[in-house]
């Protein structure tokens, strides 16, 4: 399971959204977006998810040069979303080095356009689906219901050529609820493309459950993290060690409790080290 580290950009700065919505609360971070991206990668993230909040909220693309700079200066695949509404915007992001581009509202309200974009960029377009409690999909920044529901939309957008599906649950983080495993199971049984869980991770136990979720031999391909770590729910080193499966039996996969104990032991014996790779090497040989 890949670990997608989120970098939210608003007014050229890195921000955290405690309630998952830019309209509710925004915390500006000390690190700039490039520093934040480098920080995630240095700690072990093997994917980045950049969300352009200015583009999403106002159609303002002032952050595009900064996004291109981040892409050029990290050595992991970067998925970019936020306000992507036209073929020209998709072309610009992919030309700038984006590995994948995420589309949300546009994929829902103009499936012909989405089909054309997927055709022009095979394997490069992900659909972001914001799911309401009744499985209706929200659009336009959670402000409207689309009238379409999860299962039918998965089928339609898969047929259109979506390379992946990123599922978020509207309001779930604000209510401190776990990921919606029923919706993830539905997605895994409905489409063959990668399914990414975004939001709802309250702690390592939820991350462990996502890692171990399996339906007919299929598993969640990735999980998006960011504010869970800056809020102190767990460390990135813990997340990296938990989602990586290459340790294999008899050493892993690790349970959340085992991982917390291992990290405590490591920190006690290596007080000056904050390097994720060193911790993982130690863990593998422990």
Which residues make up each language-model segment?
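Glycine-rich, proline-tolerant flexible connector loops at the mouths of alpha/beta enzymes
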Residues: 47-65, 105, 167-176
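Catalytic cores of alpha/beta
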Residues: 74, 78-97, 182-218, 239
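Short, acidic/polar
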Residues: 29-40, 86-91, 146-156
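Conserved anion-binding
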Residues: 12-24, 98-173
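Structural preference for beta-strand elements that scaffold enzyme active sites
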Residues: 2-6, 47, 75-79, 100-102, ...
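Glycine-rich phosphate-binding active-site loops on the catalytic face of alpha/beta enzymes
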Residues: 92, 96-113, 169-171, 198-203, ...
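Glycine/small-residue-rich loop that forms an oxyanion/phosphate-binding "nest" at active or ligand-binding sites
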Residues: 54, 62-119
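Alpha-helix-loop-beta-strand connector modules within alpha/beta enzyme cores
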Residues: 59-79, 114-130, 178-197, 202-203
């Amino acid at each position: 399971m890949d670990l997608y580290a989120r970098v939210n950009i608003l007014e050229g700065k890195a921000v955290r959204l405690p309630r998952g919505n830019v309209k509710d609360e925004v915390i500006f971070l000390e690190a700039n977006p490039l520093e934040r991206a480098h920080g995630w990668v240095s700690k072990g993230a093997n994917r980045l998810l950049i969300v352009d909040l200015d583009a999403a909220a106002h159609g303002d693309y002032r952050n595009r040069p900064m996004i291109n700079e981040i892409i050029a200066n990290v050595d992991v695949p970067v998925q970019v979303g936020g306000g992507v509404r036209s073929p020209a915007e998709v072309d610009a992001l992919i030309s700038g080095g984006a590995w994948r581009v995420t589309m949300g509202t546009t994929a829902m309200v103009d499936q012909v356009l989405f089909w054309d974009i997927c055709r022009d960029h095979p394997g490069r377009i992900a659909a972001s689906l914001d799911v309401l409690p009744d499985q209706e999909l929200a659009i336009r920044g959670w402000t409207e219901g689309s009238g379409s529901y999860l299962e039918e939309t998965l089928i339609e957008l898969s047929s259109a050529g979506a390379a992946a599906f990123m599922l978020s649950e509207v309001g779930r983080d604000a209510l401190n609820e776990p990921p919606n495993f029923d919706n993830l199971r539905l997605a895994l049984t409905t489409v063959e493309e990668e399914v990414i869980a975004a939001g709802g991770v309250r702690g390592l136990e939820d991350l462990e459950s996502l890692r171990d979720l399996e339906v007919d031999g299929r598993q969640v391909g990735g999980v998006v993290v960011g504010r869970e770590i800056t809020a102190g729910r767990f460390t990135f080193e813990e997340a990296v060690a938990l989602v990586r499966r290459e340790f294999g039996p008899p050493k892993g996969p690790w349970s959340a409790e085992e991982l917390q104990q291992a990290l405590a032991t490591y920190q006690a014996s290596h007080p000056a080290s904050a390097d994720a790779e060193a911790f993982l090497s130690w863990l593998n040989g422990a």
